Amino acid sequence: MKALLDLFKQVQQPEVFDAIKIGLASPDKIRSWSFGEVKKPETINYRTFKPERDGLFCAKIFGPIKDYECLCGKYKRLKHRGVICEKCGVEVTLAKVRRERMGHIELASPVAHIWFLKSLPSRLGMVLDMTLRDIERVLYFEAYVVIDPGMTPLKARQIMTEEDYYNKVEEYGDEFRAEMGAEGVRELLRAINIDEQVEMLRTELKNTGSEAKIKKYAKRLKVLEAFQRSGIKPDWMVLEVLPVLPPELRPLVPLDGGRFATSDLNDLYRRVINRNNRLKRLLELKAPEIIVRNEKRMLQEAVDSLLDNGRRGKAMTGANKRPLKSLADMIKGKGGRFRQNLLGKRVDYSGRSVIVVGPTLKLHQCGLPKLMALELFKPFIFNKLEVMGVATTIKAAKKEVENQTPVVWDILEEVIREHPVMLNRAPTLHRLGIQAFEPVLIEGKAIQLHPLVCAAFNADFDGDQMAVHVPLSLEAQMEARTLMLASNNVLFPANGDPSIVPSQDIVLGLYYATREAVNAKGEGLTFTGVSEALRAYENKEVELASRVNVRITEMVHNEDKSEGAPAFVPKITLYPTTVGRAILSEILPPGLPFSVLNKPLKKKEISRLINTAFRKCGLRETVIFADQLMQSGFRLATRAGISICVDDMLVPPQKETIVGDAAKKVKEYDRQYMSGLVTSQERYNNVVDIWSATSEAVGKAMMEQLSTEPVTDRDGNETRQESFNSIYMMADSGARGSAVQIRQLAGMRGLMAKPDGSIIETPITANFREGLNVLQYFISTHGARKGLADTALKTANSGYLTRRLVDVTQDLVVVEDDCGTSNGVAMKALVEGGEVVEALRDRILGRVTVADVVNPESQETLYETGTLLDEDAVEEIERLGIDEVRVRTPLTCETRYGLCAACYGRDLGRGSSVNVGEAVGVIAAQSIGEPGTQLTMRTFHIGGAASRAAVASSVEAKSNGTVRFTATMRYVTNAKGEQIVISRSGEAMITDDHGRERERHKVPYGATLLQLDGAQIKAGTQLATWDPMTRPIITEWGGTVKFENVEEGVTVAKQIDDVTGLSTLVVIDVKRRGSQASKTVRPQVKLLDANGEEVKIPNTEHSVQIGFQVGALITVKDGQQVQVGEVLARIPVESQKTRDITGGLPRVAELFEARSPKDAGILAEVTGTTSFGKDTKGKQRLVITDLDGNQHEFLIAKEKQVLVHDGQVVNKGEMIVDGPADPHDILRLQGIEALSRYIVDEVQDVYRLQGVKINDKHIEVIVRQMLRRVQITDNGDTRFIPGEQVERSDMLDENDRMIAEDKRPATYENVLLGITKASLSTDSFISAASFQETTRVLTEAAIMGKRDDLRGLKENVIVGRLIPAGTGLAFHKARKSKELSDRERFDQIAAEESFEFGTPETPAAEQQHSGE
């Protein structure tokens, strides 16, 4: 009976586990896995097709070929289950055991595992403390290694050649032992006492001072400690037994024509077995040493190529001269196991087809072709047919469906009712790339898609295809319906803007209907209601754009809040409006006033309208409203009948004169160039400037002509109104085209770019209406081709960036409501060059406050700590003019494994506070990666006219208010009474009456201040001016000039100006100075007071000395009296070199990879006073003396611009040498907040240039992940090593444990890792291995005996569990708490009833261990 029941075993419950451990297998372990030794290299008998006994496919070892049937056919069928046939030795069981039973090969000589030998850094080398080169020579039989020196002067692990060996043998006889090959290496590994070595290394580390040694010891210690902790023996890195993969995983498939297709692994195994057998035979025959050695070496090579072909020497090739695919190749790379089969699987119940537009659908519907639905929902239909009794068996049901009988269609309708399907369009760049819809059955073979979701899918109907997936289980349907239904996803998760905005024709229709025309038919009429206006319109008494008065009923919020009172009450008002707007007022959702429609609706307006509707009226109303807007838009666009004709492109009459004038100016520049007045570069720049201005002028003239038209109003007066020109309306509404494109149609095409990005100086003066000639046509195609090639590259690069971002953040999930931190960042409006780039309201919307927000006027608390700021709150804050709010940020969140909801704030895609379980990491990565393809690939050349801003020489206030200086602003007053700035990083702010910052400007060193702190000014007032062409050196003290080392012809040269005849002294470049002595000195000035004493810097013993750098023009004479603030020398600023600015995608990648820029600027390490030390060859030495008198030196290349001078006080983290900032320095010297501000601002700059909106918090989430490792500075009593990098959470856990045990915790500093490094250094080895460098990751993990706790999303997808995010997080939490409570109950019962359990150890403990 039992056997019968076993037969009908239920589906096995999958094993529940919480972690996966990886390690090295000992030889015994390998033997225990095995079902027998593979002795022969044969695979199958070519005549009978049966596997050869003891061969690679042997049925005795691996199991039967057919279910429940032994090889010779003696035992067949189920009743002999589990019998082992005495004739052929095969167990009668399922054939699928051939997928899981392993074999083994007993190697005649041990073999080193190539991963531990060659994967850098070599683990074998680390453990043995030998170089890789030496170990290789021993392993491949080129040298001997001393195992046991005995009483000889030789050292253990010493390498000797064959010659040496024989000499030493003669000398010492058998006093010592030396070996060759893997046996020798294995002996050495066995001899190592790990505990002893670890102790020794730890003491060495404490006592040594040399950097190199510390590094070396720390590395070795790490490996040895890993062995110590994991209990893995180092000699297991040398294989004695080789496991053999189950045969079904390396199949041999007969092709027609008697040939076979085989997996490469079979070839590789065959070679190993052949060589192994040959070696066994040679050993038995006692063959000469040299032959045996050669065979051993070949065996080692064969095993190497089986494990990782091509890692050492030439790859083994098959018959077709291709390298064979080894075990390592099977798992790594895009086509390997991880990325091909574990992370991306093909799924059943899916189909794909072309999409077409479905304008009649509701937002939550999609049209599904009947035939597709029939196929996708087959099992559901079979079930229904059986239940209804139409068919008795599945087979009969199948027939019904195949014949497509009428009853089947009725059942299909029933089955798909309220059963959502998921639509996906590749590439799925963000979560809106997969949405759920309710299917509506349609004829035809194309899927119908709702026009409003196209923006989210980035779909158009030029042949795009989409895939359909059917959620099967009830839970899946629930989730699809509640979380993924298109009508529940109306906001972009990247920035919280509506994703269901109308575009194209819909916009055109709505725009046309809401425009107003002067003196249209029926102007001035008054209508009692919308229906009357509509009737008049249909009878052609009025036009859509006629200005009329209409009584309009609005639904407004009810003031009466009592029980049972309706939420909205009607309010009737007579509005002056147009007929079209009145008709649209019918679809307004309750709660929105008519005023939102009473204006021409352009694309931006419509987007704002939908946003307002969502915030004021909620999701449901918005969706209905958007749907109705779409219907109206399409209908009205059809009625409008807007089309394009050539006559709509009006070419401005003044074009010819404008172009003619420009050509004259260009000729003039050519003439100047010919006569040598300007350089070729200047001429080019000027010509390009002229043409771009001309192009603008023609465009402006054209737009003026296009945008208005003359009309006669009702009183007969001539007036102009906005034009009803079709092309203008299309561009103005935002439906199609833009001003730039219209300029090409009817203005002039303008300047074109070459493929290298430089600008061709001859413009295309024609436009498309006039037509281009051949040269013009060629010029325009020239740069355009580069654009197309760029696009292809861009897509790949952008995809790779997204992949890296997802990988670094995939384990970041919101796991709790509040971590209780009191840290945050101060948010201010983002100001650049005096312009507000991003208002404060946009930056704090949806964030949680970390300090009370106080009303600046009444000092009362408006919003307490912990308030989530919504739209109303930020508007109030803006109204009150609060200019800084401290908010929570993901960067400072103290949750260990994940984030808390308070630090994250609002979930932008839902418009409410973020839910626990939201995978915010992946959302952040997608939000940054998704617009990647819109970013440019090119680097900008500054120097062309394309982006050459005129050099600023002053700052002007843009608003009225009070001038305020920052704390870093320092200035002196000179003899003329002017204020001269002497600080490098001073900024001037303009604040309004409430003290809110309105704008801020950097004021450079040497500028003259025209307004002082506290001055009341009007907009347009100049704050400061300076000479843009030179950088002055200014004295802060008065006195008599005394030159030092200023010798004409030695350190300075006299320069005479050709035009003016004046002479000045110039400091000569070090390289051009003659004598050796003059190379080291530095020309400088000291100041003497009235008594001839050197002027001292106040409060110090240092005398004032002001150095002149190379190239400075000295403007004072020796012995001259100077006043405070006077200029001693000027340094000409090199005319803006045409440096490339990295822009676009490469810049974003550079920031996230945390790469140090090439010539990074140098930041001051400490706060203190600067002075210059002795210069070395080509370098100048800058010394900062800190407040305690310690000196810190910097060596700076001579050609760099030093931003400080002698005696200047600098703050820690201030830039002292010009250059791009290095993010690592910012983190080290200014802290996490400054770093995050730097990265966020820089990344946002790139996206803002392309007009892409991304919320700051997404970038902050990535930065948090880049900071997730820390470097241990002092290890205290912890298990860490100084200088080691560890996970922050790991370190905090360890420190908590130390504090609990009253031991010393470790101290640490933050480290910034690029996203690739951060992904690879994650705690989860499964996730890291599936990302990049699979071999290295797995090697490292195996030695450390790493345990993967399956915390992230990726690892869980790979092992096939529910991901710990969203509903999966709740599932895992519930499962764990149930396990806990079960265990507690068990312990309780065990305590109460004292009977003996069958097993000595309690199952509770077992349960704990089974999770490993």
Swiss-Prot record:
Give the keywords, sorted: DNA-directed RNA polymerase, Magnesium, Metal-binding, Nucleotidyltransferase, Transcription, Transferase, Zinc
Bridged cysteine pairs (disulfide): none
Single GO biological process annotation from the record: DNA-templated transcription
Residue positions binding Zn(2+) 1: 70, 72, 85, 88
- Cofactor comment: Binds 1 Mg(2+) ion per subunit. Binds 2 Zn(2+) ions per subunit.
RNA-binding recorded as keyword = no
Cofactors required = Mg(2+); Zn(2+)
* UniProt-annotated binding residues for Zn(2+) 2: 819, 893, 900, 903
- What function is annotated for this protein? DNA-dependent RNA polymerase catalyzes the transcription of DNA into RNA using the four ribonucleoside triphosphates as substrates.
Please give the HAMAP family that the UniProt record associates with this protein: RNApol_bact_RpoC (MF_01322)
The name this protein carries in UniProt is DNA-directed RNA polymerase subunit beta'
Gene encoding this polypeptide? Answer: rpoC
